[in-house]
């Protein structure tokens, strides 16, 4: 690419450097002192030049210019080294070999931390002195701190290897002469064009596209991952390089600008190419400068700094970093558009002249047949194509119809069709948006029984979805700066539709059986699909996105052809789309008022069913690993309790009767025990335990308590893995203590376990039977059981006083660099309206090891009795909810006391010094000496935990 317009004069004074090096060389390069001085001189020139390139990057903002400047700087240093080598160190080697740049360096671009790839071209049968001369150059570069990838070959060897090795072929395609024998480089290029490139275009293109697909698969096959790889990811620099390789190989161009003259790209599309390349290079160069290494993943911990370096500012509803990342993803989308346009051009302009190309690039072939029911489109080898180039101009509705016809016929898209869609987006105006037929077709696509997400994704990538629904266009490529959401908002919405389609087809039974069961009975399927697509459409606005999204839906639904009743249903679903998830994960589902309040918001069984399905789709579409069986269990519990209330089967009387029935069932299950033992152990459990804990767990717990008592254990733990719910259960039996949860939480933090939930129960004889669920870490049960046993042992050691809590937590100093990128102001909400019996305290802040232990320690220090707790993490954010009472069992009603509780909690959440941190309890159970060896798990207990 041409770089003549760039001023390199401030990057390096070449004449001065050469003069200083020459003076040192005359003293003899074989002396260590002179060699060290030369190294220091060249190293300083390189560092100063790169620092100047960084300064100019900040000044002019051009990433491509920065990459050119660093490449030019490297050229000068290598040229100086070559001259010193052939004129002083090995004077007989002048003109014997050639130094050429390959890879990105061969394109005359170099990132600050990138490797330097060199090809040394030799004459056949080079002398040993030639190899020594090359080694001298390489060792100097290595000693300067550069990572140098190199090859030494003759022209003949290059040609021979290029015939069989596509990597070598690509490297030679990008060679650029730096210094030495220029005739060797010219010979290589001439022979390469004649012996390798001629008639091998289809082969090369197929290999490069296959290589691209594999690269995407490894990097994450979506351009909407919120921590993208700028170099290797979809829509990144390597995709642009692939376009350049194909263009250079097939069209014999040295610069992408020549593609405009050939009619492959329009002037506007070439400008898009230039802007995309310059932007991606700016991001990459800033990343390398910031991290001091070849960092290619745009991770959370550097995104904010890169946004600042590129001068992005916050706007209402979007932070500076979110605006920067939205621009990034829009550029990645542009790269995808350019890829499709180039593929279309390869077929349209070259396939007839080169029939061999047709079977290689995406099954290209110049054959087509009619598609029943349409005259606008034809089928071309399993792909939908345009019957005439002016189809869209004649009838803009065909811009929507194209996707509808592709869906009902199960066709892929011809790249030329998508190219023409992209070039016809201006035809999507208000008239088309209000067109009844266009909206009918769109609703049919959205609610298709086939693969609606695939078609919606194609519409989005082609730019149609954002033009047809401008409100959707506002969230295209929008990311949310947090560790919870894995994709951009538009990709999340399309993935949510994909999840709904799976449920609709009956394919979700293993993941969430209840939604699978409910879906066939949903009365308004269309409304549900619309709600799923639109539920986050108002993200990025100042106002609450649920309320704003409901307002957007009220406007869009009639346009889509929905009735007033359907519209109101969609509006309600979007307004409430977070409610069920938050209630299930942050509220005590055994508290009757939780269910009553939720049922008051839902009001009907139909709404309840649809809200559950929408909630499941939303959570599962957030990203891999976010959904798990434990969340599914919470949602099922909330659903069934609410269903019971809405259908009239929920009352205080029924709760008492259900508790009595549960006690009878437990007693019956222990039929092989003596009657005295059965009654004694069943009477240990209060109503909340009997109503909320499944019978099989009650049986396990009761057997566990009996075995512990027989063994004389005051303290015991039992572990069990649960692969379906993706959690591991640790049950702790201990004398009750106000700080028991603090110790358990702290011990878990010290063992590196993430608590997903805590069930706190007391028995009538003054013991605590606490069950904690920790997120599963290992897929294999045996590995997970060993981990759980380690956590259980840690809990026992801290409770027994063998280890101190502050010390063991301090050992968990795992670097949470990513979390440091986020700012979440500590929030404390104390309310008496969510429970009839307890005060509910909800805290929200940035997560860190030991946080739950510190919070519960403060609550205990404030004489608050924790009755139940819900621990929920959303990426880097934690929302913990505690149901508490004072020491006499009353709610916290005094305003001054509530204010003091809030202040203490906010202080510890913010990481400020708190007197409780050093006074965290340890050894709250009687010393082991008074209890024998009961704290250690027996073989029987381990087997019981494993078998369970």
UniProtKB/Swiss-Prot annotation:
Keyword Repeat: yes
InterPro entries per the UniProt record, alphabetical: ACT-like_dom_sf (IPR045865), ACT_dom (IPR002912), HD/PDEase_dom (IPR003607), HD_domain (IPR006674), NT_sf (IPR043519), PII_UdlTrfase/GS_AdlTrfase (IPR013546), Polymerase_NTP_transf_dom (IPR002934), UTase/UR (IPR010043)
Enzyme Commission number, as recorded: 2.7.7.59, 3.1.4.-
UniProt region (Uridylyltransferase), positions on chain: 1-372
Regulation: Uridylyltransferase (UTase) activity is inhibited by glutamine, while glutamine activates uridylyl-removing (UR) activity.
Molecular function terms from GO: [protein-PII] uridylyltransferase activity; phosphoric diester hydrolase activity
Cofactor(s) named in the record: Mg(2+)
Pfam families for the chain: ACT, GlnD_UR_UTase, HD, NTP_transf_2
Region (Uridylyl-removing): 373-728
Location of the ACT domain: 729-810, 840-921
Keywords recorded for this protein, A-Z: Hydrolase, Magnesium, Multifunctional enzyme, Nitrogen fixation, Nucleotidyltransferase, Repeat, Transferase
Reactions mediated catalytically: [protein-PII]-L-tyrosine + UTP = [protein-PII]-uridylyl-L-tyrosine + diphosphate; [protein-PII]-uridylyl-L-tyrosine + H2O = [protein-PII]-L-tyrosine + UMP + H(+)
Location of the HD domain: 489-605
Comment text on domains: Has four distinct domains: an N-terminal nucleotidyltransferase (NT) domain responsible for UTase activity, a central HD domain that encodes UR activity, and two C-terminal ACT domains that seem to have a role in glutamine sensing.
Family, per entry: Belongs to the GlnD family.
Stated name of the protein: Bifunctional uridylyltransferase/uridylyl-removing enzyme
